[in-house]
């Protein structure tokens, strides 16, 4: 566990991804919490000059609140390791593997972690006939950006066009009807399971970041045995991806209480509508307490 006494903490946020605004919101919330905790801190908007900023500010520990690239793909983690600056959250491997939904699927399958059937579609390449309904996702976007649920060929063509506007590889997976849930892990220990009830069709960008657009039920309305199984799956994902500090595993539970892992989030949001702080709060951890626990895991 890192000694934080007299350390200056740089909160890294912003970046250049499609999730920039969410990252700035997370960063500001964490920055304010660190100030309340009594530590020296500075908010750093990440750009190509971030290394110079870290040196200029004499940062001892980096608290990463970047969503998307370069914070969730291992880029910033690799740079910080080269610079010898301890940082919060997952390392290079878990970050780079989890941001790519296709690589994640392959790891899930090799580790026998339950996940929905899937296929890859690449731009300008032929693909197999699709059985509807399916979920279409860009391979490495977060915050539900570019995701569509489709029931027929016409909707599929529109969804593929949208997903390809973000990148050249997309993931198409079987749509599983059920309860949307998420399970967080904090420093190797499971948090209470959250049931997500969005106002819209599914937990999209608007539902995630607009107050009142989704309800978080803690714990999820599932049998205790199922909740325990969900937590164990989350811990297995945490271990298989060699996570550190925090992660959040999104899943679907169908009508038979079968569980399917959707994806791993190595940098859970820290905004007022975010799931991870809600789960921590339900077990008695204030936002400041949560930030301190995450800081202690920096390495």
For every predicted segment, state its role.
Residues 41, 86-87, 115, 134, ...:
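Hydrophobic beta-strand scaffold residues
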Residues 253-255, 293-299:
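Peripheral (often C-terminal) accessory segments that flank ATP-dependent C-N-forming ligase machineries
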Residues 144, 199, 265-279:
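Glycine-rich phosphate/pyrophosphate-binding beta-alpha loops
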């Amino acid at each position: 566990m890192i000694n934080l006494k007299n350390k200056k903490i740089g909160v890294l946020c912003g970046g250049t991804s499609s999730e920039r605004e969410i990252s700035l919101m997370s960063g500001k919330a964490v920055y304010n919490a660190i100030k309340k905790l009594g530590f020296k801190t500075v908010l750093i908007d990440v750009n190509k000059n971030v290394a110079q900023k870290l040196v200029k500010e004499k940062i001892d520990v980096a608290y990463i609140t970047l969503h998307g690239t370069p914070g969730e793909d291992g880029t910033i983690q690799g740079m910080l390791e080269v610079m010898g600056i301890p940082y919060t959250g997952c390392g290079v491997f878990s970050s780079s593997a989890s941001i790519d939904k296709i690589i994640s699927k392959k790891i899930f399958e090799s580790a026998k972690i339950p996940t929905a059937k899937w296929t890859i579609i690449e731009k300008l390449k032929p693909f197999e006939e699709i059985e509807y309904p399916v979920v279409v996702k860009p391979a490495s976007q977060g915050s539900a950006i570019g995701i569509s649920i489709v029931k027929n060929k016409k909707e599929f063509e529109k969804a593929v066009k949208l997903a390809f506007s973000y990148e050249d590889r997309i993931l198409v997976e079987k749509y599983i009807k059920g309860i949307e849930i998420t399970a967080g892990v904090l420093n190797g220990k499971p948090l209470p399971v959250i049931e997500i009830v969005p106002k819209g069709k599914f937990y999209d960008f608007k539902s995630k970041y607009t107050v009142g657009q989704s309800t978080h039920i803690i714990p999820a309305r599932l049998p205790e045995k199922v909740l325990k199984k969900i937590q164990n799956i989350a811990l297995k994902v945490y271990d298989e991806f060699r996570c550190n500090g925090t992660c959040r595993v999104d899943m679907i539970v169908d009508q038979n209480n079968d569980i399917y892992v959707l994806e791993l989030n190595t940098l859970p949001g820290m905004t007022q509508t975010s799931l991870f702080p809600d789960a921590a709060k339900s077990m008695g951890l204030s936002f400041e307490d949560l930030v301190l626990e995450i800081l202690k895991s920096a390495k």
